[in-house]
């Protein structure tokens, strides 16, 4: 009986491996927070944000500071992200209906050069 269970388990594992084969091939290309270019971009953006708020590392590590400094104005957001007129208009429209804000930390994680960056799409309010 245990041999049958083992064979069933092995067969099921092979089926599951087949289902994720495309992911296993693509995963080497998927950026993570551990990639050097991502770390450098984060540090650069963090430094820019700290300078804007005239803050220090201890502020950055304080969640109260993060909440108090959340960005909810287009004029401040434009200091960190290049927004075209259509994007500004979309943010203004969203802002008329919904409250929005992005914390300094979350902003530092966004690839501001990639408008299709998942964090950009989740954080910057547009239709």
Predicted regions and their residues:
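Flexible, acidic/Gly-rich N-terminal and inter-domain linker regions that tether
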Residues: 1-127
């Amino acid at each position: 009986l245990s041999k049958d269970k083992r064979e069933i388990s092995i067969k099921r594992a092979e089926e599951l491996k087949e289902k994720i084969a495309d992911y296993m091939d693509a995963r080497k290309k998927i950026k993570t927070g551990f990639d050097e270019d991502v770390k450098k971009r984060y540090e650069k953006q963090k430094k820019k944000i700290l300078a804007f708020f005239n803050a220090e590392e201890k502020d950055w590590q304080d969640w109260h500071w993060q909440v108090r400094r959340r960005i909810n104005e287009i004029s401040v957001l434009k200091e960190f992200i290049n927004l075209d007129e259509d994007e500004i208009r979309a943010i203004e429209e969203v802002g008329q209906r919904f409250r929005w804000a992005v914390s300094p930390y979350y902003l530092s994680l966004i690839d501001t050069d990639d408008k299709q960056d998942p964090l950009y799409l989740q954080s910057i309010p547009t239709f």
